[in-house]
Amino acid sequence: MQLLNTLLIGITAGSIYSLMAIAFVLVWRSTRVINFAQAGMALLSTYFGYEAVTRIGSFWVALPIAMLGGAIFSALVEVILMRVLVKHSSSGPIAGVAPIIATLGLLGLIRSVIAMIWGGQDLRIPPPVSNNGFTVNGEVLVFSPLKLLILITTLILMALLTLLFQRTNLGLSLRASAYAPEIARLSGIRVDLIRNLGWPLAGAAGAVAGVFQTVNGNGNFSPDSIEFLLLLVSGFIAAVIGGLDSLLGAVIGGLFLGVVISFVLMYLSGGLFFIAPFVLLLLVLFIRPQGIIGAKAERHA
């Protein structure tokens, strides 16, 4: 039973990592930028969700509001900041690096603004369903209705986004705008508008990750919550492990990372918690640099 519980703990944590990894993939696929501000956006969206829960009293209304808030904020970041940086950093000594550096600065700025508006105290979002484990043959599992909800939500979101990218003209335009923007413009695609769509989608996915990260713990969060920085690191590593161009890879990478960390904590040492993800990342990069599922983008451009 301990083995099963360890696996289920890893799957639940991995589902949340997958949601954050999906956000990284969406931004990368649309604008070829690594958005390290994603944790700050997820944290801000969680505050939006908190305000909705406090005022309306329904988690099921608060979650879409958090997603909408995250989507709008992410779109504004792309239009006001990232689009200008990408355009003006196409050449020079830090070509291509300036947008990434900017996202790190934006992460700190978001957390500071949140502290100014809401203060530094812990706030709480109660879980929407029970977090008491299911009972099987008289044994209580750690897997609960809440953890099942997190897993199902991750899979549904991945499926919907995959359909969007693979089965619609909009998805084709998003991919073309990322890989070959000049050719896409010559084909009549409004590249700037299309690129902007990847950011709000990522903001919505990150919002779900932030809210679920909160309710899957003790429900408390603050501007200094270490959980969101851990979510940032885990989500990025999961995206790289799975392949930065693959939504399916993001989900597989997140689940794989979650399970590995869970087994390391249970059977090896808690001190390896921060080391294991990076060791796993290096192993994957050595063996398969494009990730488990990731395609070689240049070949398919």
Where would I find each of the regions flagged by the language model?
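Membrane-helix/interface signature in polytopic inner-membrane proteins
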Residues: L160-W199
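Membrane-embedded helix boundary and interhelical linker motif in transport proteins
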Residues: S30-I80, N220-S222
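Alpha-helical transmembrane segments within multi-pass membrane transporters and channels
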Residues: G57-L106, V113, I252-L257, I261, ...
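Cytosolic-side transmembrane-helix boundaries in multi-pass membrane proteins
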Residues: Y179, L186, R190-L193, Y267-A301
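Inter-helical junctions in multi-pass inner-membrane proteins, predominant
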Residues: Q2-I9, L164-Q166, G198-A239, L268-G271
